Swiss-Prot record:
Transmembrane segments: none
Species per Swiss-Prot/TrEMBL record: Viola odorata (Sweet violet)
Keyword entries, A-Z: Disulfide bond, Knottin, Plant defense
InterPro entries, sorted: Cyclotide (IPR005535), Cyclotide_moebius_CS (IPR012324), Cyclotide_sf (IPR036146)
Function: Probably participates in a plant defense mechanism.
GO terms under biological process: defense response
S-S bridge residues: 5-19, 9-21, 14-26
Family: Belongs to the cyclotide family. Moebius subfamily.
Pfam families named among the record's database cross-references: Cyclotide
Cross-link (Cyclopeptide (Gly-Asn)): 1-29
Comment on protein domains: The presence of a 'disulfide through disulfide knot' structurally defines this protein as a knottin.
Name of the molecule in the record: Vodo peptide M
Length: 29
C-alpha cells in the first residue's frame, strides 16, 4: 500500500504537505 503520513483524516482532510486522505488515514501522494 501507499506510505502512511502519520496523520488520520476522519474529517476527510489532511494537513500534512503532499498527503491525501485515504480514509481514515493520510497517504503520501
Amino acid at each position: 500500500g501507499a506510505p502512511i503520513c502519520g496523520e488520520s483524516c476522519f474529517t476527510g482532510k489532511c494537513y500534512t504537505v503532499q498527503c491525501s486522505c485515504s480514509w481514515p488515514v493520510c497517504t503520501r501522494n
